[in-house]
Amino acid sequence: MGGKRLPTVKPGGGGGNGNGKWSNTPNVGQPDTLKEALGTKGKPMSVYEAVRGANPYYDGSYKEFSENCQRAVIATEARMRGYNVTAQPTYKGDKLPNTAYVNPKTGVSSAFWQGAFKGAKQEKTPTQASVESKMKEYGNGSRGILQVQWKGGGGHALNVVNKGGKIQYIDGQIGAKYNGKELFSKIKSSRTQLTRTDNLKFSDRAKKSVEVAGSRTNSKKVVAL
């Protein structure tokens, strides 16, 4: 699968379009421990494998798996580390999609999804050039999560990868990637923040975001884009 390429889609489709509804499908309980959530570590997955399998129950008609980007980014990162996991769904009253704190001096915010990592730190990256400069500074093979706000309303989180010096904007929620120039034309640049993730350890709170692939039996599987 290493040679396969992700489909490139128009920015704005991830993060839910606000038209989804809550399903009547019973949710599967969260794993009790981080070890249970991650399962056994295997061979790191390619970008293609990680992204295409991160959120297999995606369905734009329902909120659970079309507004769970805060979990899909964790699943995508975990898969690139070698864990065969998928994203858990969001749910009514879920706090993970929310902003936890905004520094009044710097304007840099902290999001609840960051709790899946130990020592996660967001940096303001208001332009495509600033994101790519940071990623190149981190080095080949580095990975991060980009938090954005769409100009049309709503927010989103996606993964960023430095592969051979080329920066890729990948979206495990919908199983696709974005053109960087198009992406930045659709987002509020002042609200864009980058968190490096490849050098961080998972915290116990990551168990709220991922589950071993195939452990969910009460959901209809929907193939991503």
PLM region spans:
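Short coil/turn linker and secondary-structure boundary residues
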Residues: 29, 45, 108, 123-126, ...
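Tryptophan-centered short beta-strand motifs
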Residues: 5, 22, 120-122, 167
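Compact soluble domain cores
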Residues: 70-138
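Sequence-level detector for tyrosine residue identity
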Residues: 48, 57-58, 62, 83, ...
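Active-site or metal-binding loop neighborhoods of secreted/extracellular toxin and effector enzymes
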Residues: 121, 129-225
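Low-complexity, glycine/serine/proline-rich disordered segments
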Residues: 1-80, 95-97, 196-225
